[in-house]
């Protein structure tokens, strides 16, 4: 039996729409991500478990884990009879890479089960393809950090899909999921087809400056450059209370904040544990909208997807 855990991820990070993403893990040791188990069987089966299993499609063929198995078999040119189990711990449409968690865990578990016939680059390409079936287009800003860990910059040149960018150990990521759903497709549809020149220039300056600040080890500058002129001005209308929450966490002491992925999760970066706790407390009281919401204080997950059992 192979059991694989794939961590949550925060895509875009305000400054890098579709080209930056970070894998995250709670500081309290909780597993914030999906788990997929694969074991040999006479025929294929899929069992859904976990807190958010009831949110998955009732038709098995619509389940992305089934589609991962089907695509993996196609890639190898043979049917692979296995019993799969998806432990769905991630809320769907949360902005935390929920579909990426399932895709990464499923494909990595299948690859491990079969003796690693696919290398990481090919596996990541498949992950992007499968995740794109849910989000509506292929982009790697969730699957790459989820699979490889850390903060990843999408390259997509010279057969390189992404490369790691050095993060800052002192940064704590406070992630607040309010408990409502925002579909990636809906969040993309709300964006304009064209942007003003000054916005394009500002976006390029922010992103280039952020990457430079990461490599030159300037955390204050990096945090200051985490600004979003591409998506946030349009998407914030989908997120009740987002603008007030951003203002509040800044007043408490967060060094940066924004929309995680396409929302509705809000991320706030803090450089001190006590600030992170106060931000988390405020968000827990004021940003969550129902019992399904949660707040986690996280660090970068540098390990990425990993085998828990084999």
From Swiss-Prot:
Any Pfam family: GHMP_kinases_N
GO biological processes: threonine biosynthetic process
Top-level EC class: transferase
Pathways per UniProt: Amino-acid biosynthesis; L-threonine biosynthesis; L-threonine from L-aspartate: step 4/5
Top-level taxon: Bacteria
Catalytic activity: L-homoserine + ATP = O-phospho-L-homoserine + ADP + H(+)
Residue sites binding ATP per the record: 91-101
Compartments in which it is found: Cytoplasm
EC number: 2.7.1.39
Chief location of this protein within or outside the cell: cytoplasm
InterPro entries recorded: GHMP_kinase_C_dom, GHMP_kinase_C_sf, GHMP_kinase_N_dom, GHMP_knse_ATP-bd_CS, Homoserine_kinase, Ribosomal_Su5_D2-typ_SF, Ribsml_uS5_D2-typ_fold_subgr
Single GO MF annotation: homoserine kinase activity
Keywords carried by this UniProt record: Amino-acid biosynthesis, ATP-binding, Cytoplasm, Kinase, Nucleotide-binding, Threonine biosynthesis, Transferase
GO cellular component, as recorded: cytoplasm
HAMAP family according to UniProt: Homoser_kinase
Family statement drawn from the similarity comment of this UniProt entry: Belongs to the GHMP kinase family. Homoserine kinase subfamily.
Function: Catalyzes the ATP-dependent phosphorylation of L-homoserine to L-homoserine phosphate.
Protein name, entry field: Homoserine kinase
Chain's gene name: thrB
């Amino acid at each position: 039996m192979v059991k694989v855990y794939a961590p949550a991820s925060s895509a875009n990070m305000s400054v890098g729409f579709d080209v930056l993403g970070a894998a995250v893990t709670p500081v309290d040791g909780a597993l914030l991500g999906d788990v997929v188990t694969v074991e040999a069987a006479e025929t294929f089966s899929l069992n859904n478990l976990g807190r958010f299993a009831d949110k998955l499609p009732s038709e098995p063929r619509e389940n992305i884990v089934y589609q991962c198995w089907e695509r993996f078999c196609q890639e190898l040119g043979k049917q692979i009879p296995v019993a799969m189990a998806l432990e769905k711990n991630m809320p769907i449409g949360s902005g935390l890479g929920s579909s990426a968690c399932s895709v990464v865990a499923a494909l990595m578990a299948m690859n491990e089960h079969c003796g690693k016939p696919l290398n990481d680059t090919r596996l990541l390409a498949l992950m992007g393809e499968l995740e794109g079936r849910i989000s509506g287009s292929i982009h790697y800003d969730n699957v790459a950090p989820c699979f490889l860990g850390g903060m990843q910059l999408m390259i997509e040149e010279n057969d390189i899909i992404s490369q790691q960018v050095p993060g800052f150990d002192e940064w704590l990521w406070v992630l607040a999921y309010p408990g409502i759903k925002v579909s990636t497709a809906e969040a993309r549809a709300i964006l304009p087809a064209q942007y003003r020149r000054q916005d394009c220039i500002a976006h390029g300056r922010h992103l280039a400056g952020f990457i430079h600040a990461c490599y030159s080890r300037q955390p204050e500058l990096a945090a200051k450059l985490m600004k979003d002129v591409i998506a946030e001005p349009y998407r914030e209308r989908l997120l009740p209370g987002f603008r007030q929450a951003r203002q509040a966490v800044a007043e408490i002491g967060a060094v940066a904040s924004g929309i995680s992925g396409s929302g509705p999760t809000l991320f706030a970066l803090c450089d001190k544990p006590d600030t992170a706790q106060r931000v988390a407390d405020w968000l827990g009281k004021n940003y969550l909208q129902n019992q399904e919401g949660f707040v986690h204080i996280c660090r970068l997950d540098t390990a990425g997807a990993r085998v828990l059992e084999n």
